[in-house]
Amino acid sequence: VHWTAEEKQLITCLWGKVDVATIGGESLAGMFVMYPWTQRLFSEFGNLSSPTAICGNPKVKAHGKKVLTAFGDAIRNLDNIKDTFAKLSELHCDKLHVDPENFKLLGKVLLIVLAGHYGKDFTPACHAAYQKLVNVVAHALARRYH
């Protein structure tokens, strides 16, 4: 994947403002609320019975932070995202059996959450760069499935 200097700057500039715990928790919770079938692999998280329960669930928040921390690894390694996510792709495919479509769904929710938190900074150009990034990350995570 080729990244322009502008894309790299837009991605890293916004990422410097991101509260990983908050954005990660809200993104994972949002995916569980908007796409409830994605909850099936998270029964150990306890109560996911309603949007209120999901959004207040400490395990959802903690895992969301973990997921977004890994997303930050992609940003630090924009020119080597496939290798950055090789082990995570293997884990999600071989051990966890996650539907690779879920990576795209989480990416969609992440974009919505970023737009909600960073409105004026989440310009159309920034949105386009982050859309490209979530697509590349989803593809890298799904790589083991192919």
Curated annotation (Swiss-Prot):
Red blood cells. Involved in oxygen transport from the lung to the various peripheral tissues. One of its GO terms (molecular function) is metal ion binding. The gene is HBB2. Disulfide bonds: none annotated. CDD domains: Hb-beta-like. One of its GO terms (biological process) is hydrogen peroxide catabolic process. This is Hemoglobin subunit beta-2. Belongs to the globin family. Residues 2-146 form the Globin domain. Heterotetramer of two alpha chains and two beta chains. InterPro entries: Globin, Globin-like_sf, Globin/Proto, Hemoglobin_b, Hemoglobin_oxygen_transport. GO terms for cellular component: blood microparticle; haptoglobin-hemoglobin complex; hemoglobin complex. Heme b binds at H63, H92. PANTHER family: HEMOGLOBIN FAMILY MEMBER, HEMOGLOBIN SUBUNIT EPSILON. Pfam families: Globin. Keywords: Heme, Iron, Metal-binding, Oxygen transport, Transport.
